[in-house]
Amino acid sequence: MGLQLGAIVSALGGELHGDPALSIERLAPLQNAQPDALSFLSHPKYQQELAASKAACVIVAPAMREAAASRGAFIVAADPYLYFARLTQLWKAHHARPEADRIHPSAVIHPEAVVDATARIGALCVVERGARIGAGTVLKSRVTISEDCVVGERCLLHPGVVIGADGFGLAPHEGAWVKIEQLGAVRIGNDVEIGANTCIDRGALDDTVIEDGVKLDNLIQIGHNVRVGKHTAMAGCVGVAGSATIGAHCTFGGGAIVLGHLTVADGVHVSAATVVTRSIRKAGQYTGMFPIDDNANWEKNAATLKQLHSLRERLKALEKAPQKK
């Protein structure tokens, strides 16, 4: 069940050059697109792929208008990648299958939980006492929302997400550990997406807070009492330790780590595999990974790095020494 180009432009805008009645049967990347597909060009460096592509139509920026015109139908959009993102939403809605039961029969929902009439609860989900699920929110299979935790409106939680497990709180005593009961909850804002098997721990006393528009990838760990600001995005395997505060509009590459009790300002972008060991007070891009190398060179560089302080002191001493004439 395809979509005509005219219908796409009518719904999303853009400047169409080509037959509005042309039907698109699939969306595909430039290099793999067939004559019934629509694709997009997000960066001029892929212009060679544009010329070679078999796609029926391509979304391009204004600067690529001439290159696109030489190969067939195209749609001009100020931001082709954003246009394509909205197109995927239109495409999914157009091809949506009939909805099954709003609440799957295998889901377990406590009588004292509050689930909005428009929310959807998937197979084997658990919603515990006092939890609240907002309008239009979707819980995929095997999601757990623990006691008193709140999920806002229009959220999407993928399979295996756990909201409100106990935070990691322990007090040492005579060589053993005494559990600190986690008495807070988790509060998730509106329009939040949480990837598969991500865990967000409940607070020890205050709540763990995920603000509106946050996007979390798969396999992320958010510790107790963390606060994540609006529209921050984190890629897979990020870990945020307890009581860290993350600002708004930040991004974290895959495998990045934030140590506990630190503050990260708004607009900070942390590269993949970076370990944040101190608070970041100023917006910008931050990277803290050790460059990859063949093992022999890596070991030599690592050994040198261990001596960096002593080498610095020797250099300072040499700089202070009287110069021979």
Swiss-Prot record:
Its EC number is 2.3.1.191. Gene3D superfamilies: Hexapeptide repeat proteins (2.160.10.10), MurE/MurF, N-terminal domain (3.40.1390.10). One of its GO terms (molecular function) is N-acyltransferase activity. GO terms for cellular component: membrane. It comes from the Bacteria. It is an enzyme of class 2 (transferase). It catalyses: a UDP-3-O-[(3R)-3-hydroxyacyl]-alpha-D-glucosamine + a (3R)-hydroxyacyl-[ACP] = a UDP-2-N,3-O-bis[(3R)-3-hydroxyacyl]-alpha-D-glucosamine + holo-[ACP] + H(+). Keywords: Acyltransferase, Lipid A biosynthesis, Lipid biosynthesis, Lipid metabolism, Repeat, Transferase. Pathway: Bacterial outer membrane biogenesis; LPS lipid A biosynthesis. InterPro entries: Hexapep, Hexapep_transf_CS, LpxD, Trimer_LpxA-like_sf, UDP_GlcNAc_AcTrfase_non-rep. GO terms for biological process: lipid A biosynthetic process. The active site is at H224 (proton acceptor). Catalyzes the N-acylation of UDP-3-O-acylglucosamine using 3-hydroxyacyl-ACP as the acyl donor. Is involved in the biosynthesis of lipid A, a phosphorylated glycolipid that anchors the lipopolysaccharide to the outer membrane of the cell. Homotrimer. Belongs to the transferase hexapeptide repeat family. LpxD subfamily. This is UDP-3-O-acylglucosamine N-acyltransferase.
